A protein has these predicted regions:
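Short glycine/serine/threonine-rich phosphate/pyrophosphate-binding segments
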Residues: 110-117, 250-251
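Active-site segments that bind and position negatively charged phosphate/pyrophosphate groups
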Residues: 202-313
């Protein structure tokens, strides 16, 4: 996979990526380096990552051996909060971290989100590198400069735009994932295909097995996102296309967070995409044919999640806190047809309830 070099960030891959990261660390001569992980990536990925970068040359190995610190967050979205951020900030202060320091966020979307937020706010900003270890992190969460934490059960309600200096994608980490983690990331790949083009959509929706997800498909998904954020890094216009499925998806994810029915991010967004496809049929002119195509594609890959009337009402109430809202309106990104979108669309509560009815059929 070819490196993707942009003005604000670089996305590097596998062995060549490690070479470039090692060179970057040597040139920057960081005073301290923090490896930020969660319990899973500490167990399954940290040793492999350190070995890969330390094997580049003895100088890098010496820097990492002498200047590095390690902090592991509890696993799961519930750790992406202000309390855990404070603990890491305190750890950085106690260990003498200054502006000439680096944080390497090794993990899935939770780690890269909170790690980027911690880095971008500590001493008004220190450098950070994202090393995503999940499919969702590789194609979506680690790319694009969105950092943040959850607060009062609201997704990513506190955060800022700040780009990682480097995003290093090592696809061998995908071997550490279970099917649930893969399918969660695949949801974002479906989203990228839907907003990109009919050809991309047809390629993705015809995948019969998770084992058929190829490196080329992952790379094309990354390129789709990069091509959008390059034109609109702070989400003033076309970057809002990437919010398809995320208005209702985030509300569902927030509502179920911390319960026995808690969903991974991609699982919640998958539901959101079906719901918002129904809204698109009613509001922005998506054809019945393409609506049914979208629903069927998700039905084949994702389990149906049941919601009763009370739960749907509670999810609706969460929508008023969505950070994409403006002037009292709940804003949706809706499809006109595969590859064509409209932003800042509205739908009333009655239509949203109808969308849940459609999803549950």
């Amino acid at each position: 996979m070819r490196p993707i070099i942009k003005e604000n960030f670089s996305i590097l891959f596998n062995e060549n990526g490690y070479l470039e990261l090692a060179d970057f660390i040597l040139k920057k001569n960081y005073q301290n380096i923090l490896f930020l992980t969660d319990a899973n990536t500490e167990k399954y990925c940290l040793k492999s990552f350190k070995k890969s970068i330390c094997n580049i040359n003895s100088k890098v190995s010496k820097i990492i051996d002498s200047n590095s610190f390690y902090y592991s967050l509890p696993h799961g979205e519930s750790s992406k909060n202000i309390d855990e951020s404070i603990k890491v900030w305190d750890f950085l202060i106690q260990n003498g971290f200054k502006r000439n320091s680096l944080i390497i966020n090794l993990g899935g979307g939770m780690v890269t989100d909170i790690g980027g937020f911690i880095s971008s706010t500590f001493m008004r900003g220190i450098d950070f590198v994202n090393v995503p270890t999940t499919l969702l992190g590789m194609v979506d969460a680690s790319i694009g400069g969105k950092t943040g934490i959850d607060f009062k059960n609201l997704k990513n309600i506190i955060g800022k735009f700040e780009f990682a200096k480097i995003i290093l994608i090592d696809d061998s980490f995908l071997e550490t994932l279970n099917d649930q983690q893969i399918i969660s990331g695949f949801a974002e790949m479906i989203k990228h295909a839907l907003i990109d083009s009919p050809n991309h959509w047809n390629t993705i929706r015809e995948i019969k097995s998770l084992k058929n997800i190829s490196k080329d498909m992952v790379y094309n998904s990354i390129l789709t996102k990069v091509n959008i954020i390059e034109k609109d890094p702070t989400e003033k216009d076309i970057r809002k296309y990437l919010n398809y499925g995320h208005t209702l998806g985030h509300a569902i994810e927030s509502y179920l967070l911390g319960t026995k029915r808690e969903l991974l991010h991609g699982e919640a967004i998958a539901i959101g995409m079906v719901l918002e496809a129904y809204l698109a049929n009613k509001v922005s002119g998506l054809s019945i044919k393409e609506l049914e195509e979208i629903k069927e594609a998700f039905k084949r890959k994702f389990d149906l999640i049941e919601f009763d009337k009370k739960q749907i009402n509670s999810i609706n109430e969460l929508l008023i806190h969505d950070k994409k809202n403006s002037h009292g309106n709940i804003n949706f990104t809706l499809i006109k047809s595969i590859g064509k979108y409209v932003i800042d669309q509205q739908a009333d509560e009655k239509l949203i309830i109808e969308a849940f009815d459609y999803y549950l059929k």
